[in-house]
Each structure stands twice: as structure tokens, then as C-alpha cells.
Amino acid sequence: MLIAVIGVNHRTAPLEVREKLAFTEWGMKDSLKRLMSYPGIDGCAIVSTCNRTEIYIAPMELDSGMSSVWSFLSEKSGLDISEIKNFTFCHTLYDAIRHLFRVVSGLDSMILGETQILGQVKKAYELALEAKTTNVVLNTLFQQAITTGKRVRTETGIDQNPVSIPYAAVELAKQGFGTLSGRSVLVVGAGEMSELTVVNLVANGVSSVIVSNRSYDRAVQLAEKFDGTAVKFDQLFQYMNRADIVISSTAAQHYVIKTSDMQKVMEQRVDQPIMMIDIAVPRDIDPEVRRIPNVKLYDVDHLQNVVDANLEERRRAAVQAEGIIEEELNEFMRWLSTRFVVPTITALKKMGEEIKQRELVRAYNRLGDLTEREKKIIGSLANSIVNQLLHNPVIKLKQYALTPEGHLYTELTQNIFNLQVEGQKPQTEIIPPEKKKKVAGGSTLNSGWDKGIAAMVADSRSRE
């Protein structure tokens, strides 16, 4: 059983191509079952997010399996296979496994170390399980990938340092207050950046959300998401008295919060400090506001400094994460190689047993009447020869199974001995000799085997 991945992401394709190759969660099961109907696909799972679509397969043969994926993507997107290949990447075996482990660890994301991808990979695996399109190889692969992603985050802390403006705003707020539990936030503006910031503030303990926006309806919509309060824009400064934190992100081309307005607010607060985070460009808050006592004002430059410092921390954590991935990768490869080698060893022993039984029958027929003791001795000799011949190959295969290249040695053994292994097919075939060499009497070279047995039988009879 082999492993391959064909995918597209933000580095390999523009958005208009990624859109055509994306899969919806509600239609995923049908898509998986459709892919399973293609030839050469023994198991499959699809990871599809806003920035990537990756199809993982466990085929009997790489060429046929990958060809089926190209056809499947062409059918789904309406694009020619040649066009799809221009925008996709393809990894097999060792590289495919490493790729998934890096993806789930956040090392292949647009934002290094981001946390969402772990849940997205887990969901992709769950959907494949529900669709019954996985097999033992994909099950083990995704289970170990999820374990790897969790281990990377636990041991390296790669996701602990925020590297986006909304996350950095929350980080600054936590630094200022120690804990955000029970704190209140006033949000000026109801756009995407405002919402992302509030999501993270609430997740970190903020209990009260007030939203003010020039469009009151937009303010209501955002406030309802957090069981908060919407206020009209002309009431902004009245409600600022209730806030510990102010987040401002409007599209205004002038200062929305002026120094004179904030002086009046702070006079009413009576030495109660307030943190103001301006994530708008151009700025919403007059920078002179920071001169007012008990006001802490941060803008995007302050936030970017936090982001840059945290990104450097994540890069250092990523180096440690790569080491963890290699450990998990080698462990999986040992398991996978064992999956390759066990059926091969079984087939090798079966071949030896079949040869032994066939040649024993020939020998018994040619030697005529034999006593049970003589048959037992001949059988014992045959067992000994077969066991000794196969001993080293079996031992070496088991040893190589513990290395990343174990499957290569296994396939080579299958080719050398022309083994028929259930669920596995050598990628290349050994061409058998056109004819066997003949010796005197018309027998094949196996006549030496017969003569050896005859000599042994004669010797045993002479001892009786």
C-alpha cells in the first residue's frame, strides 16, 4: 500500500483556480465516494480550506492512483488535466507523509503556526471516516498526523505568540490588564478587523461588548453575535465611560476620536485608566490622546512590532517543530514498512513451502517405496534446506522494515522472487528466463536435488 498527495495552495495557484478545486463540507462525503469509484483508489481523504485543497490517497499503484486523481479534479473543476497540473503539487511516499505532518503542524500555512489547520485536518479525517473511504494506512497516517500537530503545539508553543493585528491587539490588552476576565470593550467600527479582534477578546475573557458604527444596523448585527450592546455613533463618548478597552477600526479619512473628546471622557472617569487600540489606517484616534493621563494608546505600528517579535519566536519554534516531525515521520515509516514486509515474508515462506512440497512429491515418486522413517528424514532435510535458505532474507527484511527505505527492500524482494503479495503489486516485473537449462536425461537442474535425496536414502538404509 502506497501514499500520495496531490494538492493546490496559496503558493501554487491564484484564487480563481483554488475556487474551482475547493470542496464544501456538506458535499465532501459524496465527493469522497465519487473519487473511490475511480480505478486504483483504495482509500482517500480530502483536506479543503480557504487556502488549500489536498487529496490524499493510498493506492495499490502510484501511477494509476494519481492518474485517477487528475481525472477526478478535472471532472470536478471543468479544467483540463494539463492545466490543473500547472497549478498543483504532487508528493509520494516519504514526502507525502512529511507534507501532511508539516501542514497539520502549521508550518505550511500562510500564517506560520496558525491553529485552525489542526482542526481542519481532523475534520477532513472524520468526514472520510463517515464516508468509509479510508483504509488502515490512511487511518494510521491521519491519526499520527493529528498527534504530531498536537505535540508540536504543546512542546514548541508555536501558536502562543500572535502574528496578526487582531491577535496582537488582544496580546497588548492582556499585557496591560494581566487578565481580561470581566473586562468590557467598546468597538468603534463594525468591519472584519473589528469582529476578529472582538472574537479573540471574548475568547480571552472579556464579558461586555459595546459596538458603535456610523451604520447603526451594522453595529446591531455585530453586537448580536456577542450578546452585546449596539449604540449610535453620536452616543460613542457617552458609552466610552463603561469601557476598559477601546478598539477602533473604521474607514474614516480623519480622526474619529479627538483629543478634546477624550479629555472630557477622562474627566468623568476619575483616574480610571483606559486602553485604546487603533488598528485603522489612516488612524482613527488622534495620537495626541496618549498625552492624557491614564490613557494608553497603541496604533498599528505598535501592533506590528508585537507581530514581528512574535513571528521571530514562531520561526525559532518552527525549527524545533521540524525535529519533532522527523521523529514522528520515522516512526510512521517504520510502521508502514512493517505493513509492507509482513505480507512479503508470508509470501516468501509460502513460496518456499510450495516448492518443498512439490519437490518432495517428485522425489517420493522417483524413489519408489519408502518407509515412514525415510519419508520423515527426507521431509526433515527439505524443511532444513528451505528454512536455512529463507532465514537471512527474512531477518534482513525485518531489519530493513525499521528504516525509512524498508518498503524499497520489500519491493525488491517481491521482484527478485516474483512474489504475488495480496494488496501489493511490484512496480516493475522480473522477466523470467525463456527456458530452463537441460542436463543429461532430460531433467532440469533440480536433478541434483533428487540425487542428493537418493544418496541420503541409501545411506539411511545402510544404517538400518
From Swiss-Prot:
Q: Report disulfide bridges, numbered on this chain.
A: none
* Keywords, in A-Z order: NADP, Oxidoreductase, Porphyrin biosynthesis
An example GO biological process term is: protoporphyrinogen IX biosynthetic process from glutamate
Enzyme type, top EC level: oxidoreductase
Enzyme Commission designation: 1.2.1.70
- Annotated residues that bind NADP(+) are located at G189, A190, G191, E192, M193, S194
Query: Do you know which InterPro entries this protein is assigned to?
Result: 4pyrrol_synth_GluRdtase, 4pyrrol_synth_GluRdtase_dimer, 4pyrrol_synth_GluRdtase_N, GluRdtase_CS, GluRdtase_dimer_dom_sf, GluRdtase_N_sf, NAD(P)-bd_dom_sf, Shikm_DH/Glu-tRNA_Rdtase
Q: Which Pfam families match?
A: GlutR_dimer, GlutR_N, Shikimate_DH
State the Gene Ontology terms under molecular function. Answer: glutamyl-tRNA reductase activity; NADP binding
The answer on whether this UniProt entry bears the keyword Oxidoreductase reads yes
Q: Where is the active site?
A: C50
Q: Which SUPFAM superfamilies match?
A: Glutamyl tRNA-reductase catalytic, N-terminal domain (SSF69742), Glutamyl tRNA-reductase dimerization domain (SSF69075), NAD(P)-binding Rossmann-fold domains (SSF51735)
Which chemical reaction does it catalyze? (S)-4-amino-5-oxopentanoate + tRNA(Glu) + NADP(+) = L-glutamyl-tRNA(Glu) + NADPH + H(+)
CDD domains, alphabetically? Answer: NAD_bind_Glutamyl_tRNA_reduct
UniProt: substrate binding residues = T49, C50, N51, R52, S109, E114, T115, Q116, Q120
Hey, which pathway is this one from? Porphyrin-containing compound metabolism; protoporphyrin-IX biosynthesis; 5-aminolevulinate from L-glutamyl-tRNA(Glu): step 1/2
Record site feature (Important for activity), residues: H99
**Self-association state and partner proteins as the record states:** Homodimer.
Further information in the entry reads:
During catalysis, the active site Cys acts as a nucleophile attacking the alpha-carbonyl group of tRNA-bound glutamate with the formation of a thioester intermediate between enzyme and glutamate, and the concomitant release of tRNA(Glu). The thioester intermediate is finally reduced by direct hydride transfer from NADPH, to form the product GSA.
User: What is recorded about the domains?
Assistant: Possesses an unusual extended V-shaped dimeric structure with each monomer consisting of three distinct domains arranged along a curved 'spinal' alpha-helix. The N-terminal catalytic domain specifically recognizes the glutamate moiety of the substrate. The second domain is the NADPH-binding domain, and the third C-terminal domain is responsible for dimerization.
- Describe the task this protein carries out: Catalyzes the NADPH-dependent reduction of glutamyl-tRNA(Glu) to glutamate 1-semialdehyde (GSA).
Q: Which family does it belong to?
A: Belongs to the glutamyl-tRNA reductase family.
Q: What is this protein called?
A: Glutamyl-tRNA reductase
The encoding gene: hemA
